[in-house]
Amino acid sequence: MAETKIIYHMDEEETPYLVKLPVAPERVTLADFKNVLSNRPVHAYKFFFKSMDQDFGVVKEEIFDDNAKLPCFNGRVVSWLVLVEGAHSDAGSQGTDSHTDLPPPLERTGGIGDSRSPSFQPDVASSRDGMDNETGTESMVSHRRDRARRRNREEAARTNGHPRGDRRRDVGLPPDSASTALSSELESSSFVDSDEDDSTSRLSSSTEQSTSSRLIRKHKRRRRKQRLRQADRASSFSSMTDSTMSLNIITVTLNMERHHFLGICIVGQSNDRGDGGIYIGSIMKGGAVAADGRIEPGDMLLQVNDVNFENMSNDDAVRVLREIVSQTGPISLTVAKCWDPTPRSYFTVPRPDPVRPIDPAAWLSHTAALTGALPRPQLEEAPLTVESDMNTVVRVMQLPDSGLEIRDRMWLKITIANAVIGADVVDWLYTHVEGFKERREARKYASSLLKHGFLRHTVNKITFSEQCYYVFGDLCSNLATLNLNSGSSGTSDQDTLAPLPHPAAPWPLGQGYPYQYPGPPPCFPPAYQDPGFSYGSGSTGSQQSEGSKSSGSTRNTLRPPACEKERRAAGSGDSDSESDHTAPSGVGSSWRERPADQLSRGSSPRSQASSYAPGLPPPHPTTKAYTVVGGPPGGPPVRELAAVPPELTGSRQSFQKAMGNPCEFFVDIM
């Protein structure tokens, strides 16, 4: 005999039911299926069956005609029973018992209404295992008895820690709720009073169906009355659930006259329990959605125009969306903003949540304003005008938040660091500096900045152009780029100053210092007389002829040959002349000699007194100069001027002239 297997799912129960009908698969009807379910309130359910559509493939088709043939796959029928909203039968009462007005339909289990953890398992399935052998009333009564026992055991651990005396005005969540009460799409009215009439727990199997339904309707009316009183308690529910993390739902109206296409790619989510909704996969440039900017990839599509997708399968939603897009006129899209696509835990904070990370810059400025430790400079508070100092204008222009784009730029494959475009400079001046009646005046001001050196062209052009790159060349920038070691290669000739010796330290021997030192007092031993030093009094020095011997000494071995010529020629004199030795102390430095008579003529008692070494008494007025003929120990040998080749003595007169007035003639050319 032919037999048909029907597998049907009840609400959100994970385990399906199997019944066998003694009817051939091609002849089974909805009436045959309802006859098997005589112990269930079939009039309170909608019947959906697995079917095949030519356009969309496998779909869930609703069949309500009792004489309609049921679609069959591989000799069996797959069905889903969905509770009808507002049904006041035993099944409707049982749905009321699970604390939801409208349980989420099976197709949308993965949508925004399902906020349970993956480990959540409803307890209703265990209480309905024997449903086939019971009447609808007996099943409801036994279910309520189990709930009453569990409520008595868990009375001490009520939701939110409210005491027993407050349970008339507080809400509670039964642990065996058949559907989630934590969904963000459910309002606070979903949480009903956990106290119920004791009479419903004492119903026996002899209770008539009408009596049970009347009691449930009375309880339902009372619950609706409480809904208005407890509407403001939803936000006070436990913060450990998703109830306080409701999604941000927005409605966007798009004008399709300006944009020819919608510009979205949709993605459908499905699992073993049904479809989970339509989501925005990606957004194409140039479309109406991209021009609006409020809809982002990952948002869930809830409604298009007046068509709600909540109770639709993914295939039906796609079909409706295609029909609406093909029509003319504006399109309204209602979407739920997505959460963080990469959550670190199950409970995540929505992206539009007002809690934001701390901005360090804003925190620093706020703290400075409160403490007063970092007052804002007067430079930023005073408005800039055409009468302001150019240096001030340029410094404000260089601030990081000035609004002028200063960055590294490429020109002819050359990187120009911290450069600006001339047009940006003119626009910034015209916007931030008061007093310009038209942009042409701001351009003239920028040209004056270039002329005064505050702006500098890459190739040092003096005419201002708005298409050229410029860098800041003001004094502040130049000073900031200076380096004490810039240009020092170790072999270049530089004029530097040596450090003064410590007053308490003895004077070292055999070293040359660029200062005038007095002769030693008579009490000092002769060993103190360093051949490298000589002192000239202003009354005894005289210029001598070229045939005299040189009283100076040289210690430079890195001096260029031309400088060596001038040094040796200028250092000539006889044994009675005194020379003033001045030299830098850096590496690679040289001695510069000056005749004593020129020094004495241009000096004053004050200048002479300032040249004495610290820590030593000034010389006696009658003290004569100590002059040692010959070079210092370890230095090059000293030769007479006659022994110098004639070609090396030509610059003697010019060097002496330069030393006579060094402030006027000295030019250091490396």
UniProtKB/Swiss-Prot annotation:
Residues 400-474 form the DEP domain. Residues 1-85 form the DIX domain. One of its GO terms (cellular component) is cytosol. One of its GO terms (biological process) is intracellular signal transduction. Residues 152-171 have a biased composition (Basic and acidic residues). Residues 176-192, 201-214, 526-553, 600-614 have a biased composition (Low complexity). Keywords: Cytoplasm, Developmental protein, Wnt signaling pathway. Residues 142-151, 215-228 have a biased composition (Basic residues). It is found in: Cytoplasm. Expressed in thymus, heart, liver, kidney, brain, skeletal muscle, and pancreas. The keyword Cytoplasm applies. Gene3D superfamilies: 2.30.42.10, 2.40.240.130, Winged helix-like DNA-binding domain superfamily/Winged helix DNA-binding domain. One of its GO terms (molecular function) is frizzled binding. Residues 89-240, 518-642 are annotated as: Disordered. Pfam families: DEP (PF00610), Dishevelled (PF02377), DIX (PF00778), Dsh_C (PF12316), PDZ (PF00595). The keyword Cytoplasm applies. May play a role in the signal transduction pathway mediated by multiple Wnt genes. This is Putative segment polarity protein dishevelled homolog DVL1P1. It comes from Homo sapiens. The gene is DVL1P1.
